[in-house]
Amino acid sequence: MPHSDELDAGDVLAVENLNIAFMQEQHKIAAVRNLSFSLQRGETLAIVGESGSGKSVTALALMRLLEQAGGLVQCDKMLLQRRSREVIELSEQSAAQMRHVRGADMAMIFQEPMTSLNPVFTVGEQIAESIRLHQNASREEAMVEAKRMLDQVRIPEAQTILSRYPHQLSGGMRQRVMIAMALSCRPAVLIADEPTTALDVTIQAQILQLIKVLQKEMSMGVIFITHDMGVVAEIADRVLVMYQGEAVETGSVEQIFHAPQHPYTRALLAAVPQLGAMKGLDYPRRFPLISLEHPAKQEPPIEQKTVVDGEPVLRVRNLVSRFPLRSGLLNRVTREVHAVEKVSFDLWPGETLSLVGESGSGKSTTGRALLRLVESQGGEIIFNGQRIDTLSPGKLQALRRDIQFIFQDPYASLDPRQTIGDSILEPLRVHGLLPGKEAAARVAWLLERVGLLPEHAWRYPHEFSGGQRQRICIARALALNPKVIIADEAVSALDVSIRGQIINLLLDLQRDFGIAYLFISHDMAVVERISHRVAVMYLGQIVEIGPRRAVFENPQHPYTRKLLAAVPVAEPSRQRPQRVLLSDDLPSNIHLRGEEVAAVSLQCVGPGHYVAQPQSEYAFMRR
């Protein structure tokens, strides 16, 4: 049935009164209520909101993928203009018809490319399958087109990549393969569901730039789903703000950023860490979060003057950590991953030192090596004047009371079979510190300290949100009154407002207890807010280290400048200049066994500010 008269001129998609619900224990739970929007050809509509707001289920409803997951979808109108200019009602299409629509007319990029790509097929086979299905091409023609698509998404050595499997590619490469697959049939509408959330800032900048370039070439309508307002400012023409399943505000990107009307939109924007917001300030400060209950209330800024002079609590000298790679018929170690190479730094009581860099730079391995969670092959680790890298396992366990770890994924680091009260109690039991009643009181106090209720102790991890689970992990890390906490990407997977709350909590705890943090992150805007000092890692080595203000306001190393330039700015009028970022991946840090890498030489360029002198600018940043 033709529907062309019902679609406005220029529109490629129109949705009216979309309602989505799920059945849970005989009860209908509404996920989206009365949602209406349209999308024009060549336009980018950003749908923003926090986890649970209904963004992703809206995208799945458009793709007609919710019915299989038990979703109940009702909609007055869901019109799509196909590439052939025929207008169809999506809700009226049969399963067989939808298979032709998906990929050919409407394509989707998912958040996690590793789970979206089939691990047993090569990249070339997976892209070619979509082309053969929708374009009736032969296998040879499909492989030629697959290579052309990989070239189009700026993947270097595309012919070689065609024969590789997904696990052999980096996260940024896999996401580009997903984009190539989604665009292989030149769809009228592309839905991108959080395609850059888990990526490093430089890879994120590449993906955003790539989507914009390809959208222009193909005149595509793009629905971009995200909770990152910096990304929204970078890519969107219009914005739809969702809160608890409803659209609370919609408008042009300039209207939303410069004159937000709804309290939730204002709260969302206030929680965005703005790179440069700490300019001229020497000490970390709390995020100025806005409460939905009291939107006019502003909390006074408090400087984090917590660093204690004297001897450092942690001293690291020439730390080396390498991983063996086996190959050949005899499965011998022939090569090694040089994850950490001659890394040295100090950490003072009450200080936050941030380790920043892209995936593969060695920052997480450095943090894990400090607690001997990964093996180190050289160097010294001195805690409170005592060398700990040579301690026996028994003595190391006692030391772990004073150095605690907060992991990136709180759900994976909590036992799903234990109540959270038992999880927090476990370190106290292992070290035999408190008897039963005192331990229970300590758990209640810790839960209150991280903003939860004492009665939450009886619940299980799956009953909490991501932000609440991260608070539980912080409570567990605090149980033993540690002197040092290593936080490895502890807030990177959280919504922007939850992220601000967790950072504020960490700062409060540092003020109250004098804890030193080693904060490992790739989010430069968060690092700017929380850090006293910053160390930039590249290919396993520190290439710049110094006071946060010096590193951010006067970056000396080209790699530091590249990281800062890639951060999305939540200001639509400030357009980032076009740069050739698209084929820029880290060089390999895999070397032949026994091969030594020259350690960088750090030179002092200011008070406490040290920078490596690269042999050539090209070695650190391709222009």
UniProtKB/Swiss-Prot annotation:
Pfam families: ABC_tran, oligo_HPY. This is Glutathione import ATP-binding protein GsiA. Keywords: ATP-binding, Cell inner membrane, Cell membrane, Hydrolase, Membrane, Nucleotide-binding, Repeat, Translocase, Transport. One of its GO terms (molecular function) is ATP binding. It is a peripheral membrane protein. Its EC number is 7.4.2.10. GO terms for biological process: peptide transport; transmembrane transport. Belongs to the ABC transporter superfamily. Glutathione importer (TC 3.A.1.5.11) family. It is found in: Cell inner membrane. Part of the ABC transporter complex GsiABCD involved in glutathione import. Responsible for energy coupling to the transport system. NCBIfam families: PRK10261.1, PRK10419.1, PRK11308.1.
